[in-house]
């Protein structure tokens, strides 16, 4: 009993680690069955049960929508649905296949935003939740947080690895920033590059919708999270338009790889294991190297070598956007993103200092979870 208490108090020191990802649809409050007025008809009860089921299993509605869209594609393979499922603008005669850019890419992003909504909810509720219960995470609020962070860790592990693979196929490996401009403008990309970029965009669109609809209880750093998501979406959209996708790939990798260790640290914290200490140290070093050192290197390339390597002028007809306007816009957004990351780094270092030097386990973000647990208990008592 004493060992469990000690281990719990040790790991709870890391509860305040900031979270970069938004919540999930499963964090929406589900109205208790007993509080609903029961319909007397069989059809009414069936409809009522279906609604309740869809709120408890929040992956059902996205799955139905995906099934309908894919089914419609098989009915009409040449319809607009194909632009959501497959990459658009293939360049004939290219090997490996190259793809251009255009407005139809928005359909691809929206379809996979819906796909991620299903995947996220299904994996969290049907797989990760069982893992959490195996590690004795019983409080519903903490279990939901564990599900979110475990899914985030899984997603960024896949995407971070994919991003590094894509970068390895280009001259900018490993963060050779001069390559940003040597072959600019980048009108076309191989399928793996374009798919990676648009799927990342789809993920952040889905995350933004969760925040906009406020499908989870806002945390203490909600405003910073909103600013982070706005900057991220602006960088994705403008980099795609300006043909700065090589810069975007580099930034994606720095963010994704650091988020792996961030989410892993939070997962281990919920599991209550001392392994969280070395993982947290690794996380801090990866965060500083990826989100600060490498991003400052990217920012320097935008400020400096962008002007000195190849032409530096605006030509709308040739879609040559490497000029002072795009430079300043990109630099402002990267600087804003860096300021948010510095703010989070300060929080992270403060948490680490308290965890390793004191017994102070107080943090503001944990109060959110405690309030959720308290609310759930109060609600349960009222329904009894």
Curated annotation (Swiss-Prot):
It is found in: Endoplasmic reticulum membrane. It catalyses: a fatty acyl-CoA + sphing-4-enine = an N-acylsphing-4-enine + CoA + H(+). Keywords: Endoplasmic reticulum, Glycoprotein, Lipid biosynthesis, Lipid metabolism, Meiosis, Membrane, Phosphoprotein, Transferase, Transmembrane, Transmembrane helix. It comes from the Eukaryota. Glycans are attached at residue 359. The modification Phosphoserine is found at residues 41, 366. One of its GO terms (molecular function) is sphingosine N-acyltransferase activity. Component of the ceramide synthase complex required for C26-CoA-dependent ceramide synthesis. Facilitates ER-to-Golgi transport of GPI-anchored proteins. Has a role in meiosis. This is Sphingosine N-acyltransferase lac1. It comes from Schizosaccharomyces pombe (strain 972 / ATCC 24843) (Fission yeast). The lineage of its organism: Eukaryota, Fungi, Dikarya, Ascomycota, Taphrinomycotina.
């Amino acid at each position: 009993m004493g060992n469990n208490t000690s281990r719990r108090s040790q790991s709870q020191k890391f509860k305040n680690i900031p979270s970069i990802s938004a919540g999930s649809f499963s964090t929406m409050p589900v109205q208790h069955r007993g509080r609903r007025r029961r319909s007397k008809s069989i059809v009414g009860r069936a409809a009522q049960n279906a609604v309740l089921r869809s709120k408890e299993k929040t992956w059902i509605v996205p799955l139905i929508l995906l099934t309908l869209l894919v089914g419609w594609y098989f009915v009409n393979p040449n319809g607009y649905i194909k632009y959501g499922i497959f990459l658009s603008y293939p360049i004939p005669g290219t090997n490996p296949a190259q793809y251009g850019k255009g407005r139809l890419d928005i359909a691809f992003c929206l379809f996979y935003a819906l796909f991620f909504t299903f995947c996220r909810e299904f994996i969290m509720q049907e797989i990760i939740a069982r893992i959490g219960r195996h590690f004795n995470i019983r409080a519903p609020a903490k279990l939901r947080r564990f599900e979110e962070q475990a899914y985030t860790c899984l997603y960024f592990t896949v995407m971070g690895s994919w991003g590094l693979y894509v970068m390895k196929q280009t001259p900018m490996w490993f963060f050779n920033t001069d390559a940003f401009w040597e072959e600019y403008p980048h009108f076309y990309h191989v399928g793996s590059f374009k798919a990676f970029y648009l799927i990342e965009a789809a993920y952040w669109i889905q995350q933004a919708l969760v925040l906009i609809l406020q499908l989870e209880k806002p945390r203490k750093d909600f405003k910073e999270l909103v600013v982070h998501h706005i900057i991220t979406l602006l960088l994705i959209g403008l980099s795609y338009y300006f043909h700065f996708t090589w810069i975007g790939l580099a930034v994606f990798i720095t963010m994704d790889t650091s988020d792996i260790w961030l989410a892993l640290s939070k997962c281990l914290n919920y599991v209550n294991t001392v392994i969280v200490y070395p993982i947290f140290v690794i996380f801090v070093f990866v965060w500083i190297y990826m989100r600060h050192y490498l991003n400052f290197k990217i920012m320097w390339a935008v400020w400096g070598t962008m002007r000195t390597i190849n032409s530096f002028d605006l030509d709308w007809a040739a879609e040559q956007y490497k000029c002072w306007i795009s430079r300043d816009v990109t630099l402002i957004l990267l600087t804003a993103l860096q300021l948010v990351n510095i703010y989070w780094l300060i929080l992270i270092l403060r948490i680490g200092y308290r965890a390793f030097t004191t017994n102070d386990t107080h943090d503001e973000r944990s109060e959110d979870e405690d309030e959720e647990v308290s609310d759930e208990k109060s609600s349960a008592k009222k329904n009894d």
